[in-house]
Amino acid sequence: MSWKRYLKWVSFAIIPLLFANTSIKSKLIDTNLYLVKDDFQSQNQLTIATNQLAKIIVNQIEFDSNSLIANPTTVLNKELIGSKITPKLKFSDQFSNAIEMVSKLNQEFDQLANKDKTFFQFALDLLEKQEESKFDFEPKDERIDAIFFLSNLININPKQEKTLNFIRILPNLIKSIFKDTTITINIKIGGKNKVITFIENGSNVFLLSDVENFLNADQTGINFYEIEFLTFDFIVVNKTGWTLKNQPVDSFFKSVKNLPSIQKTKNGFQYSLKFRSEYNEHHILKDHFLIPIVTNQKNFSVNDIEKNGLNSYQREQITYAIKNSFTSQKENNLNISSATIKYIKDPEKLIKKSLIKPSVKNGIFYVSAQIINSNDLTKWGSKNDSEIIKDKMYFLEQNKNFPAIRTYLFQMRTKKLVLNVNDIWFKSSGDKLRVIVNNVEIDEFNPKENNTSFFESYEVHINDYFSLANKELLIKKLNLALSEMNLLIDKKKSSLDLFPKEIKLTTLKINSSLHFYLNVDAIKNQLNIEVNISKNRLTSLVYDIAIKNENELQIRTTNNYLNKYIWFDLDKKNNQKLKNELKLFLSLKKFQFKKEPNFSLKKNSYSFQIDKIIQSNSEDKKTDIIVYLIIGFSVLVLFITVFIYFHKWNKKQKMIKNKTRDNF
């Protein structure tokens, strides 16, 4: 068998990267390899079966780990990854490096000025020199390592002339025949077997997008790509002796089999990833599913929907709000099916979770809607994992025939509100003041700006007349929140009206501290706490006091919302004063605390354990005397006050009569 015949074998053009670096190339062989010009005689050639040699070399072919996705966690598209996720074949790094070293050795020999030695003698000297080295720390000669590796691979003696001459010609052999090689792989995709060409004329030609249409609907619906590699054929054009048919793919996966995206199967190996070539990732924006007020249009409230159901215009507005709550890498092409939108009166029944109740006051209501291309979402949800956005969006169901279509529950908000002043609260947050209605934040503004405002983008309807008392109540709520920022409303420079809406607020800077006035009314069984700042009453807290079962003191506020928006608490001095007031209240009732109570203005209710005071008769009498003295003193003060008031009133009446007499 002549070397010219050897030059035409190995169409293992499966050399996607002879010299594998971190980059991925489509060509199989390095065109910069140095090629020898020797034409060896037949006596210098090895005798080895072509088919056997083909198997040895093909066994060095493997998938390039740089062409595979290691962890199939993120959905990718063709723009994101380019060639990164398309599996490409190459020679193993060790084989590639060995061929490169032989190429360099050939070049070094051919450039020698003195050609007294043959290549065999030149290479043999290098081998023997390395064997004679007495020091392990001396650097290894990579050229010699390459000779040993290749001779061991083919199972031949590296010191024989035929062996070294064969190794010398290997770069020529590989480079001369790769252009005639084809590799096809039998794969299973979408439940069907397909034969796909991976290598053609020396190049990797396989693209994932080429077989994407073979995926089944379920896989497309979740952007999940699964390819099972079963067997391969190695074909050299017009060289049937080098052809290998129905070969196992195990050698292709030697260096990548431990990747999370690769799994060993009964019949081969499976590569899994999240990919769709046209995937257009949609992310949720901050303001979710908010229906804007449209000028010169009939805007709708939650009441309008509850009374009359959804009409086509309202469905269009909801569709617009859902779509524009998302942003995408490319153009926002989220396809919301307007015709499928339904008003959901009781959403908690659908998802078995606690949600904010629909309310005309804060504009919250719920709808279900189909997204035709839901597989473009970053998360599409399932029955076991329905939450897409907490409280805002939940998976309901997936279309069985078209899995990319999914139905979701959406929490919508309309900006047409119908409310009372009592529903509105404020809370400071950094430099902003948040507007809260029915425990839901719906707006915010900067109170440090002159003529600032809130509800600007809302259409607000007040259930009752916006009276002066309502205005004062709203200002008190504003001041309660503003005081945390050392601000108060400047009434002279501010205007505040909700119907018709006219809000222009200006604030004053203050540096005053809080002052607390505490009182326990033993007759009304009430605790009263008044909080003042800068000579203004900031707020008043009223608590009902009750003794239950003679072992429990209950204190409950009459305003269930106020405590949520109090930013301050009693200082140590006032806390002790309150404890003393409560102790006095209990002592009058002949009770005492079991242990020292702790009190906070930020809680709505308290429960303290108490004991009945056990006293001797003499102590009871002393206590009774004290109580009688307190009551007697209170009656005396009341009598004196009435007397003084009556005296002043009587004197005033006499003056009026005298003046009238003089006029006549």
From Swiss-Prot:
Keywords noted in UniProt: Cell membrane, Membrane, Signal, Transmembrane, Transmembrane helix
Compartments, record wording: Cell membrane
Signal peptide: 1-25
Protein name: Uncharacterized protein MG415
GO-annotated cellular components: plasma membrane
Membership in a protein family: Belongs to the MG414/MG415 family.
Transmembrane segments: 625-645
Membrane topology: Single-pass membrane protein
